[in-house]
Regions:
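Bacterial N-terminal signal peptides
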Residues: 42-50
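Active-site rim/loop-helix segments in enzyme catalytic domains that contact anionic ligands
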Residues: 61-338, 360-369, 380-382, 406-416, ...
Length: 513
């Protein structure tokens, strides 16, 4: 059950949004290990301490988009196109049995691989579909989108130890129909040296943690957040009712979060830096690179109030106007100082948030003044449906589904980074530490007020995207490119944007993240 606030519904105090279901998962998982009993106790206590004023409603099934008609989409429809020289592909013969679909793991030229995908043909699905893939020693369960028509790529990377050539694999489907007598195995050898410097580019505070906390934790990582997060919901109006004052407060709080929360992943505050540019403005800045763009909710044009949250010396905390050219210049400075071997950034084709899309554009423009090679790991925190990834906390993440009729998505490689239970726990509480992922002090304290249930305004606030469910998973998924590849990705994105009719700034999306 997901708990969602709604004015007019009866409400009561429960742990913070997402913590309820997540605690249930960790209670079951952690109780199996005697060495983590104290950690389980901490989880429960921290969850119960967070009294959140929200109303309980069961999670509603994700509706099939009206444009999707399973009869009009062929089962072999696949929007993904993989570079043939970047992975190893082989077809396998499927045998349909009463217990499920079975196949034999093939002999393949890639003897060492880190990521494995299995492409199966889905002829349609019901609500909450999932597919479980099992070997003799382990199994993984992946939840699919509700329409699930066409090729779906299942992530088998967690079964690596049980996938020797000749081993038997069983595929069991629930509420989804698998079609055909063949499937495709695709293996990736990324050969990433995670001991080398790693740079995470986050459009907003909390994006680095949602996408890549497991990957960046306990490494030589630098976290750079482009905006202060000074937009979105008016969470703190009890403390600051005037919009400019409110969003100045909210932006500063979130800027502080972006600097200190990575410490929970072993990254000290002097290696986390917030550039302080303005949330919800990147596309407007890109459209006129020299123009100074004010905040969404006020006249301020200086990023310095938000850079005061920084403690490191990556960039000076001095007055600087909010322009596109300044943003790109700052990213160039970051690249030259950090010299990363791996750069983690949004994928503008798969992430529907404008700030995420143009964050990728800014990074690629900065590459023109930084001539080193690097591996680029792209992510999406806002796939076309904010329900992705589907399924509960702790389950496996694979490629997001793409609406039929969308442009093809070219991928060089896929990289699945596994996160064990301890790392998932740390990620959970890093997310919970972010101000914008929990309810405000007024919303939490409203649990104690007699008229809580009679509020007629938008309190308790509805939080539509459950980032605790979506982000705390058995793995983090990335789309790996070389320098030329990521430049092509952004060039294709910009070409597609010239076809749209929306002027810059007309589509704000969810500016809160």
């Amino acid at each position: 059950m997901r708990f969602r606030g709604s004015a007019g519904n009866s409400g009561y105090c429960v742990p913070p949004l997402g913590i309820t279901t997540t605690l249930g998962f960790f209670k079951q998982e952690l109780s199996e290990d005697s060495g983590v009993n104290s950690l389980h106790t901490v989880l429960v206590l921290l969850g119960l301490l967070g009294c959140t004023a929200i109303a309980a409603q069961p999670e509603q099934p994700v509706e099939v988009p009206p444009a999707i008609n399973p009869h009009n989409v062929p089962a072999n429809h696949d929007p993904y196109r993989f570079d043939v020289d970047k992975s190893v592909e082989q077809s396998v013969r499927l045998t349909h049995t009463p217990e499920g679909v079975r196949f034999t793991w093939p002999h393949m030229s890639a003897t060492t691989w880190d990521t494995a995908l299995l492409g199966v043909k889905s002829a349609g699905a019901e609500s909450q579909p999932w597919i479980e893939v099992s070997t003799e020693t382990a199994s993984v369960r992946q939840f699919l989108d509700p329409y699930a028509v066409g090729i779906r790529w299942l992530n088998l990377s967690g079964l690596r130890n049980g996938l020797a050539a000749g081993s038997q694999v069983t595929v069991r489907a629930n509420a989804v129909t698998l079609q055909g007598d063949e499937a495709t195995v695709r293996l990736f050898q990324n050969r990433l040296d995670l001991r080398k410097p790693l740079l995470v580019i986050a459009p907003h505070p909390d994006d680095a943690e949602i996408a890549a906390f497991g990957l960046y934790a306990d490494r030589e990582s630098t976290i750079v957040t482009l905006t202060a997060g000074n937009a979105g919901s008016m969470n703190y109006r009890a403390q600051a009712a005037d919009p400019p004052e409110h969003y100045r407060l909210k932006g500063y709080l979130r800027a502080v979060d972006s600097v200190v929360v990575p410490w929970q992943g072993g990254i000290p505050p002097d290696r986390s830096y917030n550039l302080g540019y303005f949330d919800g403005r990147l596309d407007v800045m890109y459209a006129d690179p020299l123009r100074t763009i004010p905040e969404v909710y006020g006249p301020n044009t200086d990023v310095a109030p938000y850079r005061r949250a920084n403690v490191g010396a990556l960039l000076p905390n001095q007055s600087r106007t909010n322009t596109w050219n300044h943003l790109v210049e700052d990213i160039v400075t970051v690249l030259r100082k950090v010299n990363p071997a791996i750069i983690v950034m949004p994928d503008p084709r798969l992430d529907s948030h404008l700030d995420h899309e143009y964050a990728a554009v800014a990074v690629v423009q900065a590459l023109e003044r930084w001539d080193r090679e690097a591996t680029f790991l792209l992510y999406t925190n806002h796939a076309a449906s904010n329900h992705y990834p589907f399924g509960p906390t702790g389950s496996v993440v694979s490629l997001p589904s793409i609406m039929p009729g969308s442009e093809e998505i070219r991928l060089q490689k896929v990289f699945s980074y596994e996160t064990d239970r301890e790392l998932q726990t740390r990620k959970l509480f890093a997310l919970e530490s972010m101000h914008d992922l929990r309810l405000s002090p007024e919303e939490q304290s409203s649990c104690d007020t007699p008229d809580f249930q009679r509020r007629s305004d938008d309190y308790p606030r509805m939080i539509e995207e459950d980032y605790f469910r979506r982000a705390v998973r058995a793995n983090e998924i990335f789309y790996a490119f070389d320098r030329a590849g990521v430049q092509q990705v952004v060039a294709k994105f910009l070409a597609s944007m010239t076809k749209t009719q929306d002027p810059p700034g007309s589509k704000q999306g969810d500016s809160s993240r």
